């Protein structure tokens, strides 16, 4: 197997990998980016056709990436965002090697050894920018579903016409699950949605987008030690949509429009799913999240002395109406009798860093870092959930972390060559 020695290897060519490449290029540090697919691979191949970003375009603050012609308050479609990342990579000649899958990261002598499907790379420093979401979670009781039902995950789903005829069960009520269920229902498919206790964010409130308020209130700059439980790094994001200019995505509205809401799946006996019967408490949890968010904004406005408009009727869209809780809980669902042909699982993702053969992972297998810097000199991570701040794992935050890590790489490089010169 061919061997190549490079100064720095970056693993992953999404927004995090490209951001670190931008700053390494600016510092004239030799590096290569290894990408298992192509640039922006997850955005390109693991999102449904109509996918839009749920954060406004102004959050795409990658240096020199966003064209001035783009409306900062609009929401970019998937294909447009992919094209933006591709064009950005071309603009600074990002050294991306596509179709190179890394399977092992270890040490050989003084070098990092990166094993791929066709190549061995040796490097002085390595930056892992594969983010947190490597593979979809699938509940145990659904993993061995009979082939007569098509089992898909959110990354497999493309559009309603790509599915078998019949009703569809969507499992999971985070951003993906709710948006997919809405699209299926709007396409005339009989749609069931198994919901959890995920929050709802009002798309806009008191004249500004909810993400703008989060920025203004300092929520995006909250540090990881703000969390009282490290597991909250992986909590499901509240549901909302950037489609058609962006709007509040409400479980109440989905139910009113015809989506059949179900509680959590407890177990399965053949085609019959036993349900927890907790739809009402899940709806209340979603409502509570929205109420608490608005209360936080109101308090922030009062304390800052700002003059902003009162909430409009449209901004309060999605709130429960008079008969919102007037229904009977469903305790079980028979996939056969309900003519369900497809089950789409949208219950989040799992990380897998088992290929990293260094003592830099905690008891759950998640990287332990200080703003991306590990205890192993020369080994770094990028784009992780709450890696340094809340924004570290989203588009808005990767540039700040990339600039910081690039400086660490540069400092380490200078120290490395100074040591060599002294020998």
Region spans (language model):
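Flavin (primarily FAD) cofactor-binding/catalytic cores of flavoenzymes
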Residues: 2-13, 19-42, 76-423
């Amino acid at each position: 197997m061919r061997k190549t020695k490079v100064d720095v290897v970056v693993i992953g060519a999404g927004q995090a990998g490209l951001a670190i490449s931008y700053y390494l290029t600016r510092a004239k540090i030799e590096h290569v980016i290894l990408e298992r697919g192509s640039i922006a691979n997850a955005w390109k191949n693991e999102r449904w056709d109509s996918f839009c970003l749920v954060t406004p375009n102004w959050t795409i603050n990658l240096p020199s990436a966003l064209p001035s012609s783009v409306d900062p308050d609009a929401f970019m479609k998937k294909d447009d965002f992919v094209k933006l990342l591709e064009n950005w990579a071309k603009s600074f000649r990002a050294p991306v090697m596509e179709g190179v899958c890394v399977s092992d990261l270890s040490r050989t002598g003084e070098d990092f050894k990166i094993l791929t499907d066709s190549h061995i790379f040796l490097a002085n420093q390595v930056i892992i920018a594969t983010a947190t979401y490597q593979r979809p979670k699938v509940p145990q009781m659904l993993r061995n579903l009979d082939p007569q039902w098509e089992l898909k995950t959110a990354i497999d789903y493309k559009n309603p016409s790509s599915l078998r005829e019949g009703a569809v069960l969507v499992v999971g009520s985070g951003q993906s699950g709710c948006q997919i269920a809405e699209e299926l229902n709007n396409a005339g498919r009989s749609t069931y949605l198994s919901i959890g206790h995920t929050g709802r964010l009002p798309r806009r409130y008191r004249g500004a987008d909810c993400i703008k308020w989060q920025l203004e209130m300092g929520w995006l700059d909250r540090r990881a030690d703000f969390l009282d439980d490290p597991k909250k790094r992986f909590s499901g994001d509240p549901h909302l949509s950037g489609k058609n200019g962006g709007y509040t995505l409400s479980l109440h509205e989905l139910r009113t429009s015809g989506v059949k809401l179900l509680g959590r799946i407890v177990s399965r006996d053949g085609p019959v799913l036993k349900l927890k019967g907790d739809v009402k408490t899940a709806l209340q949890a979603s409502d509570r999240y929205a109420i608490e968010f608005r209360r936080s904004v109101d308090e922030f406005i009062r304390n800052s002395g700002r003059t902003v408009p009162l909430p409009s009727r449209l901004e309060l869209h999605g709130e429960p109406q008079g008969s919102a809780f007037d229904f009977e809980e469903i305790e079980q669902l028979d996939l056969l009798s309900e003519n369900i042909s497809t089950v789409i699982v949208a219950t989040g993702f799992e990380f897998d860093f088992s290929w990293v053969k260094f003592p830099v992972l905690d008891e759950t297998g998640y990287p332990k870092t200080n703003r991306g810097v590990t205890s192993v000199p020369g080994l770094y991570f990028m784009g992780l959930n709450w890696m340094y701040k809340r924004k570290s794992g989203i588009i808005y935050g990767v540039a700040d972390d990339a600039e910081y890590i690039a400086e660490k790489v540069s400092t380490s490089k200078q120290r490395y060559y100074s040591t060599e010169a002294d020998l």
